[in-house]
From Swiss-Prot:
Bacitracin is thought to be involved in the inhibition of peptidoglycan synthesis by sequestering undecaprenyl diphosphate, thereby reducing the pool of lipid carrier available. Its EC number is 3.6.1.27. The keyword Coiled coil does not apply. It is an enzyme of class 3 (hydrolase). The gene is uppP. It comes from Escherichia coli O127:H6 (strain E2348/69 / EPEC). The lineage of its organism: Bacteria, Pseudomonadati, Pseudomonadota, Gammaproteobacteria, Enterobacterales. This is Undecaprenyl-diphosphatase.
Amino acid sequence: MSDMHSLLIAAILGVVEGLTEFLPVSSTGHMIIVGHLLGFEGDTAKTFEVVIQLGSILAVVVMFWRRLFGLIGIHFGRPLQHEGENKGRLTLIHILLGMIPAVVLGLLFHDTIKSLFNPINVMYALVVGGLLLIAAECLKPKEPRAPGLDDMTYRQAFMIGCFQCLALWPGFSRSGATISGGMLMGVSRYAASEFSFLLAVPMMMGATALDLYKSWGFLTTGDIPMFAVGFITAFVVALIAIKTFLQLIKRISFIPFAIYRFIVAAAVYVVFF
């Protein structure tokens, strides 16, 4: 593979990663299709995907740095309040409660989850995740109980974390699972999306660090330019995607995203079967 060819592939995959990582459409589904069509598969490709995810994570940190640093600075040493008594400020406890279910299941079943990473499972996950988005739009309360991030309760944060466990199924979409869960729990579409982004930082950093540690041996110095291009591209595109997405969901529902997931599932079937 020539240098220019590899850099072009890196840029294309960086765009795909940046566009899809935080939208409820499954970055995994898109990456396996595009990677297959480009002929970029195998251990190096998996390591590359792990590295460029860091670019997407950095975009969230840049977008929400005030909120993230504010969370770190909040004192939360007092005991947990009862349901309904903790409204008024999003705290680090909300993030921790949102992390616990997926972290526990992810550590317990890491190898099993990795074994699910194949086109057929991704295709089914795309469909089921799309159905969940439709269900969330149809079944959500008419008036959200938590219109803003600072209105969320600990219970809502924990239940969103439980929904996040669905994203351990490759192709389901972490953002799709958490946003749908938030809406079903009475969090507004916009606030659920913001919480999903904030929750992504520790979750994705932890998962990416673990994957990078396990796949570090496949990275060579010759890969650095390609990985750098993918990282930077994913970062820039993710910044644009997040800003656009947060504006878009003020005006439209998630039904179009669900339909798009069904189309991607069909594309997976056509490409691989």
